Swiss-Prot record:
Name the record gives this protein: SUZ RNA-binding domain-containing
Stored PROSITE patterns: SUZ (PS51673), SUZ_C (PS51938)
Keyword field: Acetylation, Phosphoprotein
Lineage: superkingdom: Eukaryota
Comp. bias (Polar residues): 66-80
Matching PANTHER family: SUZ DOMAIN-CONTAINING PROTEIN 1
Organism annotation: Rattus norvegicus (Rat)
Region (Disordered): 30-152
UniProt entry tagged with the keyword Acetylation: yes
Modification sites for N-acetylmethionine: M1
Ranges annotated as biased composition (Basic and acidic residues): 89-100, 113-130
Amino acid sequence: MEDEEVAESWEEAADSGEIDRRLEKKLKITQKESRKSKSPPKVPIVIQDDSLPTGPPPQIRILKRPTSNGVVSSPNSTSRPALPVKSLAQREAEYAEARRRILGSASPEEEQEKPILDRPTRISQPEDSRQPSNVIRQPLGPDGSQGFKQRR
């Protein structure tokens, strides 16, 4: 690369054809490398010798599910015992018990009847007792200019 002539600008290199020569040179190099890499990798191939006897073929057994009362259960039937259907009153009683255990109250109506004491009450002051605010709405700039009112 030291003996290569370097052009002053890319325009001179394009006019002299130097860029084209370099591109063709790089293209040839990449094509050579790709040809080398296209050859399949050398992997050792194991050839089995037919003269040696092979072991017996593997045996496949098809197993069935265990029978219950002499009947093979089909995949669609469920083997779980059916849960007894609970009445509405039983479900509500269980719900109330769980709610009492978790939240400490048996029904949601009890909470609604109680006023919420956690929030502090807001004390409103009459308009005339409030102190006037001394906020300057349109400040002046540091140099005495009109600040935000300044038009550009």
